[in-house]
């Protein structure tokens, strides 16, 4: 956001370009840096996984609150996209190939599968015309089924017990979580 029209136009350009024309589609090394890659730090060392998203998700998967939140969504919404971790499970991230990533990106990161919101005191027609000319008209309309399914109600309550890791130095005192959840409507 910006109150300055020139800055706002520049921000629109930067964000639209980043989403619709990312360099990751041209350079596999970006996928390896951001997603995951093998790493060997010493010639006779252990081969490990590394990558920005891989490491971020390892951190997210180590937090008890995140573990609880993920399991709540998986149990409450098993038939929907909400059952899955949007950032990826670190154990599964390493199975993602560059080609699979590109296929997913090309299918879902398309203007036909987006909502663009503009808000504020501006010339909306001028902004929409600029977006169309600079970005949107370069794409053919696609029919993309990205409907989010509604989870059917369960006939019986579900009880689930899950466990999470703690380090040897962490206390187990007050380290138990209890969560009672319900879905209110669609």
Which positions does each model-derived feature cover?
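Helix N-cap motif at beta-to-alpha junctions
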Residues: 3-6, 120-125
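A common structural junction motif
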Residues: 17-26, 133-143
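Short secondary-structure capping/junction motifs at helix and strand boundaries
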Residues: 8, 20-33
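Hydrophobic face of alpha-helices
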Residues: 9-12, 54, 69, 128
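Non-catalytic beta-strand/loop surface segments
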Residues: 1-7, 28, 41-47, 51, ...
């Amino acid at each position: 956001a910006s109150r300055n029209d020139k800055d706002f136009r520049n921000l629109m350009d930067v964000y639209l370009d980043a989403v619709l024309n990312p360099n990751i589609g041209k350079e596999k090394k970006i996928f390896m840096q951001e997603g995951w890659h093998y790493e060997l730090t010493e010639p006779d060392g252990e081969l490990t996984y590394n990558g920005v998203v891989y490491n971020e998700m390892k951190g997210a998967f180590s937090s008890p609150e995140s573990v609880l939140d993920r399991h709540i969504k998986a149990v409450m919404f098993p038939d929907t996209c909400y059952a899955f971790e949007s950032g990826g499970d670190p154990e599964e991230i390493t199975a993602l190939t560059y080609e699979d990533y590109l296929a997913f990106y090309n299918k879902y990161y398309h203007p036909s599968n987006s909502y663009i919101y503009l808000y504020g005191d501006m010339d909306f027609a001028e902004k929409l015309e600029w977006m169309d000319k600079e970005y949107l008209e370069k794409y053919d309309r696609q029919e993309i089924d990205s409907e989010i399914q509604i989870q059917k109600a369960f006939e019986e309550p579900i009880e689930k017990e899950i466990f999470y890791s703690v380090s040897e130095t962490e206390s187990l005192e007050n380290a138990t979580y209890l969560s009672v959840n319900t879905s209110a409507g669609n």
